[in-house]
Regions:
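Extended, well-folded interaction surfaces typified by the phenylalanyl-tRNA synthetase beta subunit core
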Residues: 124-127, 136, 147
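Long, charged N-terminal interaction/targeting segments
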Residues: 98, 120-121
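Active-site pocket-lining/capping segments in soluble small-molecule metabolic enzymes
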Residues: 1-113, 131, 139-239, 246-277
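Conserved nucleotide-cofactor-binding alpha/beta core module
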Residues: 116-117
Length: 277
């Protein structure tokens, strides 16, 4: 993940084969975690000089007005030399194919692909890769891989935050804080501290868990799959994705390095059934 040019360099220097990032519009992250067009061009040059790739996120669900601005944004990104667009909306997919036909298109996890039929349909529509819904099990992934064309690349998230809703399709932030999660502005109310109250006992708040500060009753545990990266690879995953474009340099460097080490350990002896980090 790369929230800016410096974090992109950290990701590459600590072992990433490819980096994903976004422009100020269409990228599912608020302003501080995006690139200017000039930074994107410079970063693509930096990555390509080191044999790495840059994928541009365009995975919001655009309004009618935003859709009018898609062609220019796509052509600008193509001029910068990005290696693929990551999209969630069918209109964006079509626009990418129309205005940058030579650049690969990946379907974002926001698309909510949870089965082989959806993945196969994505391939027929021109997707080079699908980023699977984070809710899929290893068995689900293996079945999907077995029933889809081998040319279709499979990508899965292996580390980072998990949304309480299926693949981020959540309106809680919009409802409670007026901040649209589908515009990269999630306030993460699922991580706030909540108490239980009973309507006939106003003012009496009950802890749901054992934590004296309240209990996190909505959010899922964060994802960490490094200890069983071998099982993910054996299920048929081609690309491992780390969440965190808005995270710190330290996070990008340390997590990228950890998964680089885990993946290299597996690839050094993929036939070993007793994989350990």
């Amino acid at each position: 993940p790369a929230g800016d040019a410096e974090r992109l360099r950290y990701a590459i220097n600590y072992g990433a084969d490819a980096v994903y990032c976004g422009l100020p519009e269409f990228g599912m992250r608020s302003a501080p975690a995006n690139f200017t067009p000039e930074q994107l061009t410079e970063s693509v040059i930096y990555a390509h000089a080191r044999g790495r790739k840059v994928y541009l996120t365009m995975n919001t669900l655009p309004t009618n007005e935003e859709a009018d601005r898609l062609p220019e944004a796509i052509k600008e990104a193509a001029k910068a030399g990005v290696d693929a667009f990551i999209v969630a909306d069918l209109g964006v997919l079509d626009a990418c194919k129309t205005f940058a036909p030579d650049i690969d298109v990946h379907l974002s996890t926001q698309t909510g692909i949870t089965n082989w039929a959806a993945a196969r349909a994505a391939y027929k529509m021109g997707a080079k890769r699908v980023v699977l819904a984070r809710e899929m099990t290893l068995q689900d992934i293996a079945i999907l891989r077995d029933k889809t064309p081998p040319e279709l690349e499979i990508e899965a998230f292996v580390h980072g935050a998990m949304c309480m809703s299926v693949s981020g399709r959540c309106l809680l932030s919009n409802y409670m804080a007026g901040r649209d999660a589908n515009r990269g502005q999630c306030a993460q109310p699922c991580r706030w501290k909540y108490y239980l109250s009973e309507e006939t006992r106003p003012g009496q708040l009950y802890e749901i868990g054992e934590n004296e500060n309240g209990s996190y009753i909505l959010n899922a545990n964060d994802m960490c799959t490094a200890p069983f990266i071998d099982l993910i690879c054996k299920a048929g995953v081609d690309s491992l994705k780390i969440e965190g474009r808005a995270k710190t340099f330290y996070y990008v460097a340390s997590v990228t390095a950890a998964y680089r080490k885990a993946l290299d350990a597996y690839l050094a002896d993929p036939a070993n059934d007793n994989f350990e980090l």
